[in-house]
């Protein structure tokens, strides 16, 4: 798994516990889970492209010709 062994994962876990403390870990895990879920949802949904003609950046085609 990405070249990381069990020993490295344990060291990272201990460092996270020391830095954030045991009380903050559920909040961090929940936030990370929500972020991953939202990322997966965003990548699986089709892109929404606005194809309506007309205004573009607050200007109309007529304004572009005059400039």
UniProtKB/Swiss-Prot annotation:
GO CC, one annotated term: TAT protein transport complex
Sequence ranges of Basic and acidic residues compositional bias: 58-67
UniProt superkingdom: Bacteria
Record GO biological process: protein transport by the Tat complex
Subcellular location: Cell inner membrane
Main location: membrane
UniProt-recorded Gene Ontology molecular function terms: protein transmembrane transporter activity
Alphabetical keyword list: Cell inner membrane, Cell membrane, Membrane, Protein transport, Translocation, Transmembrane, Transmembrane helix, Transport
Keyword Transmembrane: yes
Sequence intervals crossing the membrane: 1-21
Protein family per UniProt: Belongs to the TatA/E family.
Described function: Part of the twin-arginine translocation (Tat) system that transports large folded proteins containing a characteristic twin-arginine motif in their signal peptide across membranes. TatA could form the protein-conducting channel of the Tat system.
Name assigned to this protein: Sec-independent protein translocase protein TatA
